[in-house]
Amino acid sequence: MDKVMRMSSEKGVVIFTKSSCCLCYAVQILFRDLRVQPTIHEIDNDPDCREIEKALVRLGCANAVPAVFVSGKLVGSTNDVMSLHLSGSLVPLIKPYQSFHN
């Protein structure tokens, strides 16, 4: 779990993904459309993939990926992110990390 916490706090917006996950891709596109360039960790390319998945679930992700962290805090998985976006709560959360240049 230490590795996940360290990785999740390296940058403002961090997303743990798997290269074959279509929901991971959708979440990445949402953040890019909102002018945020998240740090992406494709865990299937990490030798500690299993341990990372277990740690993400222990932290509260319903599914291990995608797992979105903002300011080092777990936002959640796809449903959590989409719910925040639809309620208008996501943009204020990520505002410090938005770029006005795309």
UniProtKB/Swiss-Prot annotation:
Protein name (record): Glutaredoxin-C14
A GO cellular component annotation in the UniProt record: cytoplasm
Gene assigned in the entry: GRXC14
Record-linked InterPro entries: GlrX-like_pln_2, Glutaredoxin, Glutaredoxin_subgr, Thioredoxin-like_sf
Subcellular compartments: Cytoplasm
Protein family (similarity comment): Belongs to the glutaredoxin family. CC-type subfamily.
NCBIfam families for the chain: GlrX-like_plant (TIGR02189)
Protein purpose: Has a glutathione-disulfide oxidoreductase activity in the presence of NADPH and glutathione reductase. Reduces low molecular weight disulfides and proteins.
Disulphides: 21-24
Gene3D superfamilies: Glutaredoxin
Pfam families xrefs: Glutaredoxin
Keywords tagged on the record: Cytoplasm, Disulfide bond, Electron transport, Redox-active center, Transport
Residue ranges annotated for the Glutaredoxin domain, each copy included: 1-101
